[in-house]
Amino acid sequence: MPIDMNALGAETPWTQVTVTQRQIDSLCSCLEDYNPLFLDEEISQQSSNGGVVAPPTFINCFRDFKTTLVLSETEVDLPLLLHGEQVIHYYKPVRPGDTIWHKIKVVDAGRKKSKTYGELNFFTVLIKLKNDADEKLVEATQLFFVRDK
């Protein structure tokens, strides 16, 4: 299924979410990552972080938001979607109590050759997270391939 090339440049509005310790606890439980820097205020206060921080993979909690943009704008069938690559640049830690603003944009689309699947459609999204002070927290790109039916 070809990607709707009109999706190139499509983006979501800035949307906010407040990070809670409960969200961080849930993610750590799912990952079976019990690092005290993510879970224990007393221990994490003694670290260079100066308090509890969210695990780096916390940004993936915004996946539903991303999927909505991708599926509606690119007109891709979810079962045909393959994760290609992900590059994440971290600028500041995400902490419980932070209000995070996030935005996603389709920045590239086209066709590429794959060793396994032959020629595939692809698209890349840019994910931006910032805090209430307009400080950049995270920028990430994710490449997705779309198998032909």
Task: Give the location of each predicted region.
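Hot-dog-fold acyl-thioester-processing enzymes
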Residues: 1-85
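HotDog/MaoC-like acyl-thioester-processing domains
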Residues: 1-5, 93-149
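Residues in well-ordered beta-strands of folded domains
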Residues: 60-61, 89, 143-145
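Short acidic (Asp/Glu) patches
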Residues: 81-90, 107-109
